[in-house]
Amino acid sequence: FFIVFFFKFYQTKDLKKLLLITFILIIGCYVYKNHDDFPYYHLTYSLNLSENSFIIGTGIFSHGFRTFSSLFYYHSLLYMPGINFYLFHLGPFLILVFFNISILLELRERFKSSSINFSYYFALLSFIIINVVFYRIVEHGTDRSAQILLILIFLQFFDILYFQKDRKQNLIKINLFLIMIFLASSMKAIYYLYILLVP
């Protein structure tokens, strides 16, 4: 997502705004503490993924090793030389930043084009609810990030179904919609029910 949106912002000369918002919000990464289960199994699972290339039979160690999540694989990508595992808790924060930037840009575009409709008010209400209810990164396990992405999925769904008339933009939104569905559903095993939204 970040690569796709990076190129989108780079083409529209909004890269400076993206970097400014990210820099301002990165302060939150130092303020918030980790999830309560982070030392229990988030850290050990992600560290095991980043340090070992062949993992089999680890489910006997603890409950956390039996519940896979794409968020843990994402955390293992944040393992960097010199920094080691100190950025593992950054994953949910980056998803929250991605949501805020996406919604703010969507609201700005709709306000400039004077296309204020149901989708605009749904995006505005979603922005308020997510930032009031989900602002505590300490509560973000594997489920909160998927719920944040689910709000974006519904926004894309309404735009595709009711408001998007341009065929090229519609195709881009459908691709983004499918990627977000599979990403949100892979964050927790029960969220595979989101795949029912695909047809």
Question: Model features per residue range: what roles?
Answer:
Residues 1, 33, 81, 129, ...:
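Transmembrane helix irregularities
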Residues 14-37, 128-131:
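Transmembrane signal-anchor helices characteristic of membrane glycosylation enzymes that use polyprenol
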Residues 134, 172-199:
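Membrane-interface alpha helices of multi-pass inner-membrane proteins
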